[in-house]
A protein has these predicted regions:
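Structured catalytic-domain cores with a bias toward divalent-metal coordination
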Residues: 1-194
Length: 194
């Protein structure tokens, strides 16, 4: 058991840190619990709503079910060195935001904050989960090369192939987490602007 018996005795916040197999921008995934959305919006990158309802068995689900403030930060592609800097920036910003440390004690805080806020410029601030393309190993799913997170897609656009043939976008939207690795149960997601 990792939490105090009385969860109200102090504020517990979970910042769940990740990278993805696809290239693209950093973003956050907020839950419907408490201040999750406000915490996620603080980082200045796009916020995805309702995605936690489509993905079960995650750390984010666990903390959300316990009604604790939690959100996920996706820093970028696994191999991108900038993902490390984005993660560091997210951690420092969150520590300041929840009152663990004062920003003036961090000499590079404004630079760290700028790292993420510059990424969020000219992008949709908040998007909502719309579609999940679930897969299983026997499907032999293969995403078409070149899709990035937050890339606009059109209804009918070829996205992937599997053992049954071509997979086309069921509607227009924004691509999220196209799968470019061997493991996973999610081929891709489609989100839409709120």
């Amino acid at each position: 058991y990792i939490l105090p018996d009385n969860k109200n005795s102090r504020r517990v916040v979970l910042l769940d840190l990740h990278t993805t197999s696809a290239e693209g921008i950093a973003y956050t995934i907020a839950t419907s619990t408490g201040g999750s959305r406000a915490l996620a919006e603080n980082l200045g990158v796009p916020v995805i709503l309702d995605l936690d309802k489509a993905i079960s068995g995650t750390t984010l689900n666990y903390f959300s079910e316990m009604e604790l403030e939690s959100f996920c930060f996706e820093a970028g592609q696994h191999e991108d060195e900038e993902s490390v800097m984005r993660t560091v920036s997210a951690i420092w910003q969150m520590l300041v935001h929840v009152g663990c440390i004062e920003s003036y004690k961090l000499p590079l805080f404004e630079d760290q904050k700028k790292v993420l806020h510059d990424l969020g410029k000219n992008l949709a601030g908040t998007v909502r989960y719309k579609y999940r393309h679930g897969i299983q190993p026997r499907d032999r799913f293969k995403m078409i090369a070149g899709f990035d997170n937050f890339q606009v897609i059109k209804k009918g656009q070829l996205l992937a192939h599997d053992r049954n043939g071509a997979i086309y976008a069921p509607f227009s939207g924004i691509m999220l987490m196209p799968l470019y690795q061997a493991q996973g149960k999610d081929g891709f997601f489609i989100v839409e602007e709120v």
